Amino acid sequence: MAQDSALPLLPVAPTYVSWRDQQIATYQAGTGRPVLLIHSINAAASAFEMREPFQRLSRQFAVHALDLLGYGNSSRPPWRYRAAIYVDLITAMLDRIGEPTALVASSLGAAYAVLAAARRPQLVSRLALICPTGIGQLDRGPGIAAYTVYQLLRSPFGRVLYEALTTRASIRIFLASQAYANPDNITLDRLEGFYQTCRRPGAYYAPICFLSGLLNCDIAPTFATLPQPTLVVWGSDAKTSPLALASNFVRTRVATKVVTINQASLLVQDEQPEAFMAQVGPFLASP
C-alpha cells in the first residue's frame, strides 16, 4: 500500500514488512523495553483501537503495533483465514523485535497472543489481555457448519450483507452495543476511523472468516501452563464478552490476575485510557 494512501490509524506512519508475500503495516514509537500491541478481530478492527495505549506507553517503552493481515493498512488478500495465520504472524513479529516483549492484546487477538507466547516463551516477558476470548467463548474449532457459513458469506449475498453491516449507521450501532459503555464516547472522529478501515479494497475477506467461526481457537490447554505473568483487564459493562467470562481464565490458571475497569465495555483501553493505564502501566514496568 502506498504510504500516502495509508489510513491515519496511529500518530506515526506505518512501516511495511513483507510476510508470506504480503505487506504488514507496523508502527513503532518510544524507547525502552519493548511492548507489542495486538488489536481485536471484527469487521472494523485495526491498530486504530490501540491508539491510546500506543501514545501513552511510548513515553516509557518502545511500543510496537501492527495491523493484522486483512485489516487496517496491511494487505487484504482473498484468503480463507484461520487462527493459525495470526498466531504465525504474531510469532514473526516477536522474532523481528528479537528481545523479550510484553504483549498487550484484545479479544480474539489476545487468544492468538497467548498461543504465540507459548510458542516463543523466551521472547514474551508478560501479557496484558483485554476482554480475552478462547476459553468459554469463540473456542470451538471450525467444523462443517463453519465452512458452510463461510461459503455462503463468500457469495454475492455475503458481500451485500457485509456492505449493510459496515455502513456508518451500522458501525455506530455495533460500537454502542458492544464496544463502548457510553454511546457519547463514540465521537465523529472515532466513528470515521472505524468506518474507513471497513471500506478498503479486500476489507471483507478476513471478517467473513471471523463471522463464520473459522478464526476461533481453544487456548485453555495452553493458557493453563503459560509461564509468563498475566494480567486480564475487563470492562465492567462488556456485553458480548461479559465480565463473568473472566472466571474461566482464573479457573484455568489460578495465578491469573483480573482487574475490572468501570464504565467501559470491550474497548476498555480506548474508552477509559487513564484507568487502563493505571493498571497496565505498572504491570508492564514490573521487573
List the predicted regions and their residue ranges.
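An N-terminal hydrophobic leader/cap segment in hydrolases
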Residues: 1-15
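Conserved HGGG/HGGXW glycine-rich cap/lid loop of the alpha/beta-hydrolase fold
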Residues: 22-73
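Conserved catalytic-core motifs of eukaryotic protein kinase domains, centered on the activation segment
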Residues: 47-49, 74-79, 139-140, 243-244
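Active-site loop/oxyanion-hole signature of alpha/beta-hydrolase fold enzymes
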Residues: 51, 61-104, 269, 278
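Conserved hydrolase catalytic core segment
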Residues: 99-141
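Conserved alpha/beta-hydrolase catalytic His-Asp/Glu region
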Residues: 138, 163-224
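Conserved loop-alpha-helix segment in the C-terminal half of the alpha/beta-hydrolase fold
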Residues: 225-264
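Catalytic active-site module of serine/aspartate enzymes centered on a nucleophile-bearing elbow/loop
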Residues: 254-287
